């Protein structure tokens, strides 16, 4: 690779690292923050506020990128994240901390969308597969580095420095972005009219979905929220079909793209089961340290990267449908094997290689399909909504898997069995979905 390409990759890694490490590094300091700021039972708002802001920011990035150069949007996202981090570090009360986390979340939403769009503009296949594998694996690697870095900082400094550490990283990222984020093929359509009605309906839809996910008081309200969300979605679809430059380009959702979005949503739910609750199980039930549990999970990231470095060779021999079905089968098999070897960390680590191969293909290929099979003018918007789909899947996954993990031993056995059973059911559902709905096209048969 040329020097500029290498610098672009480093910038993407730093951008993803800042977003990915937030949860794992902050979670260690929750007891201290709770005591210092007298947060009480509201302490979970640290994550909730961040996630809500991230979800709000995700889809608007596509609209911004259709009007402004990516370099300006990237710098704005990094500045928002840096300002939010700095304010978090300065926080002297819980209200200020939550406001700061919202600002930080807005910045993170911008950065996460860019990590899906920049590879398309900067790299051609098969190099793009490798780059996306490296960038995507940052999530897994951060699960190890986060506790280690966070523990080291808390050993010698206060929790405020967990936020300050982002600032020098962001400054380096801004310098690299200014240097490398110049793409000749980048297109903007700044003269188009802003789709206010579409944006309003979309955020009403997202608000209803998020309320249904986060509300834990009256389940009836959750049900009503989902019903209203469906009604709003139908109105949104009808409105956006007749807009020249829609906020949500519904005409892009053909059979293939729709299938990819559904696949990514369900896969994100499964990934949360592995990434969040296998480490929790290893620590709570088997007595491993955070670092040891992170090392058990690490093979998933290694397999993820390895698969992407060889993906173009695999696609030369097998069709898209076959590889997807193999990926879902690997996910199913890995969940079953871990269920039988649930008390053996070494076996779990080995089997997570299979899961890593599965996640590596699904996430990377889903992203590339959206990049390549949507119209050039709508690609940035579609990638922003694709990122939103992953984040919603992660939120739904953390909620559902958390509920299943909280169920004590019963017909499913130890509580991790409940999570693994859910992954197995989703894997079977994905297999059925692709067998029934995917139709191979001649251009896709040997990618």
From Swiss-Prot:
GO cellular component terms attached to this protein's record: plasma membrane
Keyword flag Transmembrane helix: yes
Gene3D superfamilies, per the entry: MFS general substrate transporter like domains, Multidrug resistance protein D
GO biological processes: response to antibiotic
Transport listed as a keyword: yes
Membrane topology: Multi-pass membrane protein
Molecular function per GO: transmembrane transporter activity
Upregulation: Not expressed constitutively.
Name of the molecule in the record: Multidrug efflux pump SdrM
Function, in words: Energy-dependent drug efflux pump that increases resistance to antimicrobial agents such as norfloxacin, acriflavine and ethidium bromide.
Transmembrane regions listed in the UniProt entry: 6-26, 42-62, 70-90, 94-114, 134-154, 161-181, 194-214, 217-237, 260-280, 286-306, 323-342, 346-363, 392-412, 418-438
Pfam families: MFS_1
Domain of life assignment: Bacteria
Species assigned in the record: Staphylococcus aureus (strain N315)
Alphabetical list of InterPro entries matching this protein: MFS (IPR011701), MFS_dom (IPR020846), MFS_Drug_Efflux_Pump (IPR053573), MFS_trans_sf (IPR036259)
Localisation per UniProt entry: Cell membrane
